[in-house]
Design a protein with these regions (language model features):
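Long, structured protein-protein interaction/assembly regions in large complexes
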Residues: 3-223
C-alpha cells in the first residue's frame, strides 16, 4: 500500500522541472544547471551521468556507450586515483570467469599477453587470496595495470548479468559449473573496452561502439 501511495503522488522530473532541479543543485548557476539537465535528458532514465575534471577551461558533456554495474573496489591497493578513490583503466582487456581462479598459473598466459601488449586488465571474477596478493604486488611494483572486481548481480541474477557483460565487451565467460575448464582461459576469450572506472560502489565500463550483438541483446531485454 505504501508503494501504491508513493506511486500515486510521484512527480516525473522532466523538461523545465529538470532544468530547475539541476540549477538548484548547482547553487542557482543557470548555465551549469542547463548543462547537467541536458546530460540527463540525453542519456534517459536508464542512463548514468558522471562528473569529471575537465582537461580544458570548458565545461561540456560527452555521451559514451557503456554500462554501470554494482561492483566496487575490492582492495585499496588497486586504486589509481587516490583523490577520488577510484581505479581507472584505459583501454583495458577484460577477463570474465564465473568460477574462482585458484592460482596465478591459470591466468599466466593472459597476464603475459597484457604486459607484452602494454594494455591494462580488468578481471571480473572471484579470485583466491593468493591470486589477489600476487596481482596487487605486481600492480604496486608497476609491472602490470590491473583491477579486480566481483561478478555482477546477486544470486540467481549473477549468471544472466555476467552474460550481458560478456556480450557488451566481447568476452567469453569461463564457468566450471557449465562444464568449462579453467585451463581454457586464454587470450582468445578476452573482451575489451575503452575505459573502466571503479569506485567504492560501482564500475562503469565505456565502449568505443555498440556491436550488433549488444543491440540484439538490448532488443531482447526490452521485449
Amino acid at each position: 500500500k505504501i508503494n501504491d501511495y508513493l506511486e500515486s503522488i510521484k512527480i516525473n522530473v522532466k523538461d523545465d522541472l529538470l532544468d530547475n532541479v539541476a540549477t538548484i543543485s548547482c547553487n542557482n548557476d543557470v548555465k551549469l544547471g542547463k548543462i547537467i539537465s541536458e546530460a540527463y535528458k540525453s542519456v534517459g532514465k536508464d542512463g548514468v551521468v558522471l562528473m569529471e575534471e575537465s582537461e580544458t577551461d570548458e565545461t561540456y558533456t560527452e555521451i559514451v556507450d557503456g554500462v554501470q554495474i554494482e561492483c566496487g573496489i575490492t582492495s585499496p591497493h588497486l586504486i589509481t586515483d587516490t583523490d577520488k578513490q577510484r581505479a581507472v583503466l584505459e583501454n583495458p582487456l577484460i577477463l570474465i570467469v564465473a568460477s574462482e581462479i585458484p592460482n596465478v598459473r591459470k591466468i599466466q598466459n593472459v597476464l603475459e599477453h597484457v604486459i607484452k601488449q602494454n594494455r591494462s586488465l580488468l578481471i571480473v571474477a572471484p579470485v583466491s587470496q593468493q591470486v589477489k596478493a600476487a596481482l596487487i604486488m605486481n600492480k604496486v611494483k608497476g609491472n602490470i595495470k590491473v583491477n579486480i572486481i566481483d561478478l555482477p548481480g546477486f544470486g540467481p541474477t549473477t549468471q544472466e548479468t555476467t552474460k550481458d557483460l560478456a556480450i557488451l565487451t566481447g568476452a567469453t565467460v569461463i564457468n566450471e559449473e557449465l562444464g568449462d575448464d579453467l585451463d581454457a582461459i586464454s587470450i582468445d576469450i578476452l573482451g575489451e573496452a575503452e575505459k573502466a572506472v571503479t569506485d567504492t560502489k560501482n564500475t562503469v565500463i565505456t565502449l568505443d561502439d555498440i556491436t550488433q550483438d549488444v543491440e540484439d541483446r538490448i532488443d531482447e531485454v526490452i521485449k
